[in-house]
From Swiss-Prot:
Belongs to the heat shock protein 70 family. The keyword Chaperone applies. The gene is dnaK. Keywords: ATP-binding, Chaperone, Nucleotide-binding, Phosphoprotein, Stress response. Residues 599-623 are annotated as: Disordered. This is Chaperone protein DnaK. It comes from Xylella fastidiosa (strain M12). Coiled coil: none annotated. Induction: By stress conditions e.g. heat shock. Gene3D superfamilies: 1.20.1270.10, 3.30.420.40, Actin, Chain A, domain 4 (3.90.640.10), Substrate Binding Domain Of DNAk, Chain A, domain 1 (2.60.34.10). It holds the Pfam family HSP70.
Length: 638
């Protein structure tokens, strides 16, 4: 069995870890960084850039550079959270045929968020393969604890498109607890994991216990907000900068994608700087221009101002903490330790708010950027048998049930139920002689079905006609360890049964996934060909440069006919380099190498000939000296 890698697929950054010698290890990417920006860009020449390379060119290619797509994964275009983002990102968010939120490139090509995420996962997969020296096909991928079924399914689909068999979907706070608690001694304890990442927020209350020599991690309760994170903090800074500039110059920068991308980068930098300093300056020369000429943005931002801008966001993260504690039946004094996860928790105001709520300082010995990936790797190690004596008991974050008469949401599995789990309930018909029922599966906490997330609808036909209320329809829910739901409905009299693995009404169909897998494979081949083309061009450029230098140095010493041949070969190679035919470039390179070799040989021969001619007058003297030395040696022997 090969390695099962652990991947933290983050909104802003992603991280990869493996188990090595029984311990988790974060693997650096090809740029030498321990985290990779979750950014994918499509260039004009068709190249796909991922990570730091995509981030570097974002300012000059804003409409084709996609970031924070995790906020869109598994969501409908009409969702309020998606609508809120429409004018705040420089790229286009569009509606797919099934109502899902997709993105589109500047030339109109539509892409599913799963496809974008798959590009990031592919980079993680390649990083692992380069490090391990073997093929990697299996992974544990983390998701926010508060992700619903659609979002979990979509994340698995992204893994599949990237060529990964996702062995387990694991909640981010639970993964962080695994990374933190695996080697810790000190008996049973309850911890709170406060996870404020780039795009999502979760809090989980977890009990770590020793049971018969086995370390057990049991999630007691979880809560959160899948649309609250560092991106929202950045947006507050962007809005402030835009409003200040508008007041000063009368120009709204929101309408300029290029300016918006520059503002995003500057806002993120300013926010990070203010975690360690009291004041920073946002300086963006030539941010825009009007009839009077170019305009420059120069605004001072203090830590106090930033904290005022995001105060409600920080407070918004505390309410889920209160709910999670209440669901777990605990008080803040029952929590022994608080762990911070996610880059946004580096902000002093966030740390203070958490300390004030829980009544204790959060721990600082957990790396907020790496803990989740390490936990995913540990879970992979458990599944592969590399890590022993660890039991993870996670929960479902939201209640699951069906719509019943009058539009009521009837819960079958309550939120915070330990998974995997099964539950069933018996229902009946609403009308006399009814021969079929529609089972509408929902997820959420509202009493009215229409306010909850619709996961699936299916029909159970073949019910024996009878007066209303008499038929007995048993509806069973089965949640697997990934938090993914299977539902069945059975007529207890006829034993007619209908089973479904819940595939959200949104999400990708099998044929779409297969097409994307094929596209990804083709793209991998394209990438390989592109790399080969670049190598051929680079070799040709080096050859052109060295040959031009040789002509400059030796051109006057060799025949005009040879120089003519070299110049002709040079021109042919320079023309080939401008094209995309690797074979042509290599063939012309070979021709130039051969004539350049002739040039080198001719120049060397000419040099030797000149050297021989210059030394002819002194050759006799040299011979005499040699003979004299030879004679003297002979004379000595006599």
């Amino acid at each position: 069995m090969g390695k099962i890698i652990g991947i933290d697929l983050g909104t802003t950054n992603s991280c990869l870890a493996i188990i090595e010698g029984g311990k988790g290890r974060v693997i650096e990417n090809s740029e030498g960084d321990r985290t990779t920006p979750s950014i994918v860009a499509y260039t004009k020449d068709g190249e796909v850039l991922v990570g730091a390379a995509a981030k570097r060119q974002a300012v000059t290619n804003p409409k084709n550079t996609f970031y924070a797509v995790k906020r869109l994964i598994g969501r409908k275009f009409g969702d309020a959270e998606v609508q809120k983002d429409l004018d705040l990102v420089p790229y286009k968010i569009t509606q797919h045929d099934n109502g899902d939120a997709w993105v589109a490139t500047a030339d109109g090509k539509k892409l599913a968020p799963q496809e974008i995420s798959a590009k990031v996962l592919e980079k993680m997969k390649k990083t692992a393969e380069d490090f391990l020296g073997e093929k990697v096909t299996e992974a544990v991928i983390t998701v926010p604890a508060y992700f619903n079924d659609s979002q979990r399914q979509a994340t698995k689909d992204a893994g599949r498109i990237a060529g990964l068999d996702v062995k387990r979907i694991i909640n981010e706070p639970t993964a962080a607890a695994l990374a933190y608690g695996l080697d810790k001694k000190g008996g049973d304890r309850k911890i709170a994991v406060y996870d404020l990442g780039g795009g999502t927020f979760d809090v989980s209350i977890i009990e770590i216990a020793e049971v018969d020599g086995e370390k057990q991690f049991e999630v007691l309760a979880t809560n959160g907000d899948t649309f609250l994170g560092g991106e929202d903090f950045d947006k507050r800074v962007i809005d402030y900068l835009v409003d200040e500039f508008n007041k000063d110059q009368g120009i709204d920068l929101r309408k300029d994608p290029l300016a918006l991308q520059r503002l995003k980068d500057a806002a993120e930098r300013a926010k990070i700087e203010l975690s360690s300093s009291q004041q920073t300056e946002v300086n963006l020369p030539y941010i825009t221009a009007d009839a009077s000429g170019p305009k420059h943005l120069n605004i001072k931002l203090t830590r106090a101002k930033l904290e005022a801008l995001v105060d409600d966001l920080v407070r918004k993260s505390i309410e889920p903490c209160r709910i999670a504690l209440n669901d777990a039946g605990l008080r803040t004094s029952d929590v022994q330790e608080v762990i911070l996860v996610g880059g946004q928790t580096r902000m002093p105001k966030v740390q203070q708010a958490v300390a004030d709520f829980f009544g204790k300082e959060p721990r600082k010995d957990v790396n907020p950027d790496e803990a989740v990936a390490l936990g995913a790797a540990i879970q992979g190690g458990v599944l592969a048998g590399d890590v022993k004596d660890v039991l993870l008991l996670d929960v479902t974050p939201l209640s699951l049930g069906i719509e019943t008469m009058g539009g009521v949401f009837t819960k079958i599995i309550e939120k915070n139920t330990t998974i995997p789990t099964k539950a069933s309930q018996v229902f009946s018909t609403a009308e006399d002689g009814q021969s079929a029922v529609t089972v509408h599966v929902l997820q959420g906490e509202r009493e009215q079905a229409r306010f909850n997330k619709s996961l699936a609808k299916f029909d159970l036909a073949g019910i024996e006609p009878a007066p209303r209320g008499q038929p007995q329809i048993e509806v069973s829910f089965d949640i697997d360890a990934n938090g993914i739901l299977h539902v069945s409905a059975k007529d207890k009299k006829t034993n007619k049964e209908q089973k479904v693995e819940v595939k959200a009404g949104s999400g990708l169909s099998d044929s779409e996934i297969q097409q994307m897998v094929a596209d990804a494979e083709a793209h991998r081949e394209e990438d390989k060909k592109f790399q080969e083309l670049v190598q051929a061009r680079n070799h040709a450029d080096g050859l052109i440069h060295s040959t031009r230098s040789a002509i400059k140095e030796h051109g006057s010493k060799v025949g005009g006919e040879l120089i003519g041949r070299v110049e002709a070969s040079l021109a042919e190679l320079e023309a080939a380099v401008k094209g995309d035919d690797k074979n042509q470039i290599e063939a012309k390179s070979k021709t130039l190498e051969e004539v350049a070799q002739s040039l080198h040989m001719a120049a060397t021969a000419e040099q030797q000939s000149a050297s021989t001619g210059a030394g002819a007058g002194s050759s006799a003297k040299v011979d005499d000296v040699v003979d004299a030395e030879f004679t003297e040696v002979k004379g000595d022997k006599k």
